[in-house]
UniProtKB/Swiss-Prot annotation:
This is ATP synthase subunit a. F-type ATPases have 2 components, CF(1) - the catalytic core - and CF(0) - the membrane proton channel. CF(1) has five subunits: alpha(3), beta(3), gamma(1), delta(1), epsilon(1). CF(0) has three main subunits: a(1), b(2) and c(9-12). The alpha and beta chains form an alternating ring which encloses part of the gamma chain. CF(1) is attached to CF(0) by a central stalk formed by the gamma and epsilon chains, while a peripheral stalk is formed by the delta and b chains. The chain crosses the membrane at residues 26-46, 86-106, 130-150, 204-226, 240-260. GO terms for cellular component: plasma membrane; proton-transporting ATP synthase complex. It comes from Haemophilus influenzae (strain ATCC 51907 / DSM 11121 / KW20 / Rd). The gene is atpB. SUPFAM superfamilies: F1F0 ATP synthase subunit A.
Length: 262
């Protein structure tokens, strides 16, 4: 952080590479690393799928099989309907979010400095620390909730659910509609902000630890064990947040698909 104050250093690391100003702008770094994470996921799983063998599997095949069976077991326990779409969706969500989260383990200065060699002055590499990315994913989940609700109950069932629940009387239709709308909207919003909040906080802590290296020798020496300890703990955080996003998606879709009347 030579030539920068602490506040300038932190502000620089929290600035996006973007086009445009104001609300209507595109975070190029978020898009790039989101797509990169998806490509890594597709490459690894397609490669393992092509080389899958009934004999003694390799380490990567074992890992992929464990993850697939684990996710399929979770979907089987929580989603009581056809799993041909939900199970692959859950697997994709978990692996994709995990890979995006794992980018946070790369030292905070490495990627921005590398990008600086190509004249790129701002770069945030963790897509899930960008609220626009997490909101985008949660909005997709929101539309899937509506789709599975209509698929299982029909459009009339959807209208009935949002007008006659929890109070089954025509006089309470406005109250029911407000309550159910708030409940429905709270699902994608909570999904987005939970993932964003945890990853943003994790990224900020890494940046604050990096600031310690520019202080005196005693504080800089303290930063090394702190960095290592937080990185180890953060492995749990990135895995847990990927699991929570996947799990809540499956649960929300299961509730939407439930054919039983309330």
């Amino acid at each position: 952080m030579s030539g920068q104050t602490t506040s300038e250093y932190i502000s620089h690391h929290l600035s996006f590479l973007k086009t445009g100003d104001g609300f209507w702008n595109v975070h190029i770094d978020t898009l790039f690393f989101s797509i990169l994470a998806a490509v890594i996921f597709l490459f690894v799983f397609s490669r393992v799928g092509k080389k899958a063998t009934t004999g003694v599997p390799g380490k990567m095949q074992c890992l992929v099989e464990i993850v697939v069976e684990w996710v399929n077991g979770i979907v089987k326990e929580n989603f009581h309907g056809p799993r041909n779409v939900v199970a692959p969706l859950a697997l994709t969500i978990f692996c994709w979010v995990f890979i995006m989260n794992a980018i946070d383990l790369i030292p905070v200065d490495f990627l921005p400095q590398f990008a600086g060699l190509f004249g790129i002055h701002y770069l945030r590499a963790v897509p899930t620390a960008d609220i626009s990315a997490t909101l985008g994913m949660s909005i997709c989940v929101f539309f899937l909730i509506l789709f599975y609700t209509i698929k299982s109950k029909g459009f009339k069932g959807l209208v009935k659910e949002y007008t006659l629940h929890p109070f089954n009387h025509w006089a309470f239709i406005p109250v029911n509609f407000i309550l159910e709308t708030v409940t429905l909207l709270a699902k994608p919003i909570s999904l987005a902000f939970r993932l964003f909040g945890n990853m943003y906080a994790g990224e900020l802590i890494f940046i604050l630890i990096a600031v310690m290296y520019s202080a005196n020798m005693a504080i800089a020496a303290l930063g090394i064990p702190l960095h290592l300890a937080w990185a180890i703990f953060h492995i749990l955080v990135i895995t847990l947040q990927a699991f929570i996003f996947m799990m809540l998606t499956v649960v929300y879709l299961s509730i939407a698909y439930n054919k039983a009347d309330h």
